[in-house]
Amino acid sequence: MIRKAFVMQVNPDAHEEYQRRHNPIWPELEAVLKSHGAHNYAIYLDKARNLLFAMVEIESEERWNAVASTEICQRWWKYMTDVMPANPDNSPVSSELQEVFYLP
């Protein structure tokens, strides 16, 4: 398994709405994530800094990257643009983090 972590932002007035939209996520999106090898996906909110920290275990980079081209992911990204900063393709603005420590 490959561990990935990344940081995104959420709009200051959208914390509750962001959480509402993720509890639960659309069943179709959950199915796509799982079918593309995503496991143990978690997102944490730092309310003071409007930051989202996400962590996911994936089976392969290729399968993980393929999620972005699915119709359901494209719809989800568009759905989320009013609660978080987005790139021109509607994907969330994010920065991948480098793992510096892991305790199995």
UniProtKB/Swiss-Prot annotation:
Residues binding substrate, per UniProt: 18, 41, 76-77
Transmembrane feature ranges: none
Pathway listed: Carbohydrate metabolism; L-rhamnose metabolism
Cited Pfam families: rhaM (PF05336)
A GO BP entry: rhamnose catabolic process
Gene3D superfamilies per record: 3.30.70.100
Function in brief: Involved in the anomeric conversion of L-rhamnose.
Protein name: L-rhamnose mutarotase
Organism per entry: Shigella dysenteriae serotype 1 (strain Sd197)
